[in-house]
Amino acid sequence: MDRLVDRDISASMFTATSHDPLPTHVRTVVVGGGIIGASIAYHLSAAGENDTLLLESNVLGSGTSWHAAGLVTGARGTTTMTKLAKYGLDFYSRLEQMSGLDVSFQRCGSLSVARTAGRVDELLYAKDVADQQGVRTEWLTEDRYKELWPLATYSGVAGALLLPDDGHINPGHATVALAKLAHSLGTQIRENVAVHKVLRQGDLVVGVLTDQGIVHCDRVILACGLWTRDLAATAGVKVPLYAAEHIHVRSAEIDGAVPELPVYRDLDNSYYIRHEAGRLLVGAFEPDGLPRPVEEIPSNGFAEFGPEWEHFAPIRAKAEGVVPALASAGFDRFLNAPESFTPDANFAVGETSELSNLFVAAGFNSQGIIFAPGIGKELAEWVISGTPGFDSSAVDVQRFSGHQNNRNYLKARTKEGLGRLYAMHWPNLQMETGRNVRRTPLHARLAELGACFGEVNGGERANWYGAPGTSPTYDYSYGRPNWFDRVAEEHKAAREGVVLFDLSPFAKFEVAGPDALEVCQMAATADIDVETDKAVYTLFLNDRAGIELDGTITRLGLDRFLVVTPSFTQQKTAAYLKRIARGKAAAVFDCTAALATIGVMGPKSRELLSRISPEDWSDEAQRYTHGRMVEIADGYAYSLRVSFVGELGYELYPSADMAVNVLDALWEAGQDLGLKLAGYHALDSLRSEKGFRHLGHDIGPIDDPYSAGLRFTISMDKPGGFLGKDALLKLDPTAPDHRTVYVALEDPDPVFVHDETVYCNGLPVGRMTSGSYGHTLGRAVGIAALEPDADLSGDFEVQCKGRLYPAKVSRRPFYDPKGERLRG
């Protein structure tokens, strides 16, 4: 594993320019000369943005790129990630020809091994997604496995998946090749220039302070790996990531270690193996990682830690058990170097919430080589156009909560994060470290009543309930998990009786001031100039008419509005509203922590509320989508008659200090009504049956309202327009780029995850964007995006873990298509 210390292949490229004075102004500064920064610089220049300066504090590739194993693949676990990975794999196959440099790209394939039934399910699911996106796959027989990897035993193998077009590349050489391409298209590159600070004026970046002076610019892109967090902090921006040790060892020479060996991923044993010059390289993604604070990592390039043979011993023993030649050959090199990890094991990409012209691309969780080309391309487009051209929901840096940037929290989470790459990616998987940091006002009481909590972006929420007095835990499955029956009971109670949801994690903002209406009108596609206490469901678009957010806006008064959006969009919602409010006589207040939210849902919700409140709860007193302040329990709360479950329901907004009082009163009063507590898994099941969209799955920044089937949210004629209207006017509402439909399997046994391929008359025509088990319908149900010309009268099937299941497809939800139950 050669370091690029001698710089042979780059010396002729940059000698002529590396000693020139820094420019005083450029359009774009990219900070970080690793493979991510080089890819961004190349893709910017390839798109015509050649007034770009790439700054590297040492030499190109000397941060973390140099020591990466260089594994590349065309498949990941979701459609979006597979598209990004596939682009990267195709790009690397052309990089040598494009750049004229040897990047040692070896297309040897990759072999992923399953040793448990659950892992077999995961690989079959991944195979379905790969097949859907045109990535070649092969499910291996024992004989084929032995043919491809004669050095490995077959003992304990439950299944194996081959991706024949995968391979590996020299990451240092690839970094320099990308930089050469960028340089040839006009990008300026400076090595040995340290950036000390990102400079800002108000809410905008204006330049960077380096050890060689100030460079003024119109925008900055931070792609400096594990140093991104601290550099962003110089401008008051939070980018949560933390370093951990990543270990690989190299064997002595082994007979049979040939270049044709596929990359071997033993996922259940937490290691990979690849060929290297007649030897085998073994790398670990152990479940008990070793976090390292950035202060302990040298900033002068090519940082390494000392050997950790004792820590590596369990992985080594497993690898030697599978490949006995490793034990007999021994190892002649131990490499231990830093990688950076985020709290949820997805990378941090995009425009920051704090500064509208500061972008980041960091925290790649040991997948930077795989995703560098794809993210370079997509972020370049994002920077140029101002909006993402891909579904960025899972990687958008704005998804994180502010407290997740805390170093104590990050250190605890990173110990787990390293191993998450090879750990099981179960549906609804919950992180285990860094928990119980951010809780709702009802958390303790719900724990007493049997809640099993999950976490979204650092916040705890009740996902399902065991019996009161128990401490339920997760037992995951790609089929029916251990909470399936409990959620079925919660679901039934919501449909037939009454349930309580703790919806306090919802992001909540008050917009107030003389220009508050103007701000909300510009933010929302719907007309918000409505009567006081009227709630409106709306979309929030970007400049391309893509859906950035969805939620409700309730008019509280002449110049006061309550905006409620999904919990994971708290930072994004704040940024969206504040940017529109900039320069206007309106303030945006985050009241998420100040207000609890209790969902009282089900046909008996009206009866329950009347027992603890003297108010009139009739339909005439509070109509659907209307709110009011009510006297309830021993205090007051704002009551909003809306429901995400498809039944009569109310959202109560007591102040945080009164929330437990309201919950206790409801719980005590509802026992003879069969009242149950319900969690977010039941909420997902209920909304799937009703066909309500889920932001981040069914709708996102590349989906316009027409394609999403949400045309009813648009008010083209309201005064002043709205953000994204100009782009929306250019679209033909009768010719969307895809068709959103509702899907239900005929077989009652399978369970949807998402991204399953949908077939019509034997041909693939789309994919499931989200799904759950519809306990009222007694089958898996969800939402799909189909090709616009798909024949809805055809015979439909959905592929689940390699098997096709007959399905029904409809333009209208299968449950209560007219929405009569909502209106009570």
From Swiss-Prot:
Q: How is the cofactor bound?
A: Binds 1 FAD covalently per subunit.
Q: In which pathway does it act?
A: Alkaloid degradation; nicotine degradation
The cofactor named in the record is: FAD
What turns on this gene? Is transcribed only in the presence of nicotine under the control of the transcriptional activator PmfR. Forms part of an operon with purU, folD, nepA and nepB.
Residues recorded as bearing Pros-8alpha-FAD histidine in the entry:
H67
| EC top class, as a word | oxidoreductase
In terms of superkingdom, the source organism counts as Bacteria
GO terms for biological process, alphabetical: nicotine catabolic process
Which InterPro entries has this protein been placed in? FAD-dep_OxRdtase, FAD/NAD-bd_sf, FAO_M, GCST_C, GCV_T_N, GcvT/YgfZ/DmdA, GcvT/YgfZ_C, TrmE/GcvT_dom1
**Listed Gene3D superfamilies:** Aminomethyltransferase beta-barrel domains, D-Amino Acid Oxidase, subunit A, domain 2, FAD/NAD(P)-binding domain, Probable tRNA modification gtpase trme, domain 1
UniProt keyword list: FAD, Flavoprotein, Oxidoreductase, Plasmid
- MF terms (GO), sorted A to Z: 4-methylaminobutyrate oxidase (demethylating) activity
Q: Which reaction does it catalyse?
A: 4-(methylamino)butanoate + O2 + H2O = 4-aminobutanoate + formaldehyde + H2O2
Q: Which family does it belong to?
A: Belongs to the GcvT family.
**Job description of the protein:** Catalyzes the oxidative demethylation of 4-methylaminobutanoate produced from the pyrrolidine ring of nicotine. To a much lesser extent, can also use sarcosine as substrate, but is not active against dimethylglycine, methylaminopropionitrile, methylaminopropylamine, and alpha-methylaminobutanoate.
Which protein, by its recorded name, is this?
Answer: 4-methylaminobutanoate oxidase (formaldehyde-forming)
Q: Which species?
A: Paenarthrobacter nicotinovorans (Arthrobacter nicotinovorans)
Gene that encodes it: abo
